[in-house]
Amino acid sequence: MEFSLANLQPKERASFALRALYEAAGCRKYHMGRFEEYSLYQANRSFLSSEQVITFTDLDGRLLALKPDVTLSIAKTAQPAPGETLRYYYHENVYRPSAESHTFKEIAQMGLEMLGAVGEAQVQQAVGLAARSLEQLGAAWVLELSHMGYLFGLLDALAVPETARPALLDLLREKNAHELRAAAKAAGLDDAGADTLCALLTLCGGCEETLARAEAFCKNDRMRAAAAELRALTRSLSAGGGSVRLDLSLAGEMEYYNGLVFQGYLQGLPRPLLKGGRYDLLMQKFTPGADAIGFAVYLDELDRLSAPLPPVQQQKTDRVMLNVALPKGRLGDKVYGLLARIGYGCAEDYNATRKLVVENPEAGIRDFLVKPSDVAIYVEHGAADVGIVGKDILTEASADVYELLDTGLGRCRMCVAAPNDYQDDPSRPVRVATKFVNIAKNYYASIGRDIDIIKLNGSIELAPILGLSDVIVDIVETGTTLRENGLKVVTEFLPISARFIANKASYQFKHREVDR
């Protein structure tokens, strides 16, 4: 029987192509032949994509783990000599929680690491191999670059306290300008400083134009050095072609990443396929004075490329279509009315049809009518490019999306409410009725209060009236329902309004359509 590469799955074909690429670049294959002790992952848990790890007890009583990561093991065992650069690639399965199944999943991963003496040449080689890796995978691609030195330099220039930096970086990653400004003010920045930090979100786009603006924006030598490194790097990449973009709000974990960070996207996939960066701070935990840069490719994502597009999403026009998830109900009606007034309405009145998809090919818009609680899911998983969703739903789902705009629509607040005569008893857990389980847990954890959660799906106000709970956590708009049922607001802790969100991969390929 004749063997043909065409009979292989996409991830199998990719593994052959990437192996040939990495070996031609002088990389040796690294194989993890043993289980690591759980303590390795526990000590470096913020480097991992999830703190949840599968553990087991070995025959000698040691607590071991099924590997959630390969880079940590390579960094621990490599031990490069001074002046030496080690180059490894790997093809391993790692074990991580799946966002889709909410269970642990075996994930096929290939990656490349350069450790030891890592200078400009090694950085350019590593990022060049990342770009060439994307080229091997058979779809349009984007490689997105940023630099932690640029971010740290700006935070230094603005005198941002160390304790405030992780939260600000999280908001930068989300492109969440409205909450970033408030957090900056809370961290002690004045209006000018908050505006300067928010301006970082505008430093994204094509390399030449964005670099010119980034260089003009520099406040100190650290920022200028980072911009110079990015300019040299993009010049080396331009010779190889491809779609390379800068986004200086892209940030890695600040405890480990200190230089270049990057992500790679393939058209048709809802999340980054490739992630990498310079992690000298991690490497120096194991080998003082050594540096490191590397990346991982998530091969399982390629299986999605072989699935045919549903008919409703197949291109019927030369114009790029922006897929919008609209919530059914009053909020969706308001948003649709706004879109229609600026030329993005559809020929069919979506309130007068039972269709769930309506479109306007001339305007390049396609609307999906979705249950409000599902909007974030459709956007996160790439079924829709953008959507309008309440902050309550977005927070409850912890959706991995860009939160681009606070529309100001549907303003209300998340509150703790209780009977008018309620007195907290600190000697026992508070019984909390809510449909926002994660929001309630996180709020009470932030104040150090033990709770028992009672999940309900409606008529939440009834729970304390009948003694089912002590308090409720729910959305309050006017407070009329609470007052008419003998309840009062105890605490307001989360302002709610409708947010404009975007899928992170869609934003790379349709940023012009999203920004318009």
What label would you give each PLM region?
Residues M1-L64, Q124, G128:
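TRNA-binding/sensing appendages of the translation machinery
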Residues N7-A25, E36-E37, T71-P82, Y89-A139, ...:
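Positively charged, Gly/Ser-enriched RNA/tRNA-binding surfaces
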Residues M32-E51, S146-D156, L250-G259, E461-L468:
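Beta-rich nucleic-acid/ligand-interaction surfaces
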Residues E51-V53, L63, L86-Y90, I107-G111, ...:
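Broad gene-expression machinery/nucleic-acid interaction feature
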Residues Q52-D58, V160-A182, L266:
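Acidic, His- and aromatic-enriched active-site or binding-groove loops in soluble protein domains
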Residues Q52-S101, V375, E380-V389:
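Glycine-rich, N-terminal phosphate-binding loop and its surrounding beta-alpha-beta segment
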Residues T317-R516:
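Domain-level signature for soluble enzymes in the chorismate/prephenate branch of the shikimate pathway
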